């Protein structure tokens, strides 16, 4: 998909750059594969704000995506590629040989009419899903499971991919986009190829209103607030905050390590931080 620019007849159109979605299906999603979705506005079940600067936006219908791909050894044909407001990638509607319909994350180079299949050992081509242990070293993958049968958890955003770089005693070493190398069980499934819509990162929203359509409210800095609202707030006139940068809850930000899950440290072969320092 290409990027789309506009004749600058207004200030917002001058900087607006969006992904050209003219090739996508223009109708409604399959009703049996959708469900309602209520907007939380960034609030939890107590009604308290847990994610700031969220709210409003266009109403969305949730599309049920098959992240498990456990309908093994049954070919499916790609019926159409669709837009999904709930994620940055595009989705593909596939029809299995027994006429069952399903949505999957669309990888790059997947076209209408293509055939996809999932199984323990299948052809290495975009859209096919199989166990990591059976993939050749060097394969580009996405939709990676972290626990066997739980469904894809990693590498699902637009344009992302990981690479199988080695094997180690029933585990597979996968290099992620961040540079991190991680051990994942060989029986975890992954899908061949990179995720669709790589141009998403080059889009420019163009105006504040488009951000509001996406459900994003204005993001204001702590240093512009009052002392009651943020540790950086207050002061006479403009101030620098007067302390090292912290979150609204007083925890150090900008570089402070926050990872505490020591039980899974053994699965990280190379930290993403170390790989950056080497570069």
Swiss-Prot record:
SMART domains: Ribosomal_L2 (SM01383), Ribosomal_L2_C (SM01382). GO terms for cellular component: large ribosomal subunit. GO terms for biological process: cytoplasmic translation. InterPro entries: NA-bd_OB-fold, Rib_uL2_dom2, Ribosomal_uL2, Ribosomal_uL2_bac/org-type, Ribosomal_uL2_C, Ribosomal_uL2_CS, Ribosomal_uL2_dom3, Ribosomal_uL2_RNA-bd_dom. Keywords: Ribonucleoprotein, Ribosomal protein, RNA-binding, rRNA-binding. Gene3D superfamilies: 2.30.30.30, Nucleic acid-binding proteins (2.40.50.140), Ribosomal protein L2, domain 3 (4.10.950.10). Residues 36-49 have a biased composition (Low complexity). NCBIfam families: rplB_bact (TIGR01171). Part of the 50S ribosomal subunit. Forms a bridge to the 30S subunit in the 70S ribosome. Belongs to the universal ribosomal protein uL2 family. This is Large ribosomal subunit protein uL2. It comes from Beijerinckia indica subsp. indica (strain ATCC 9039 / DSM 1715 / NCIMB 8712).
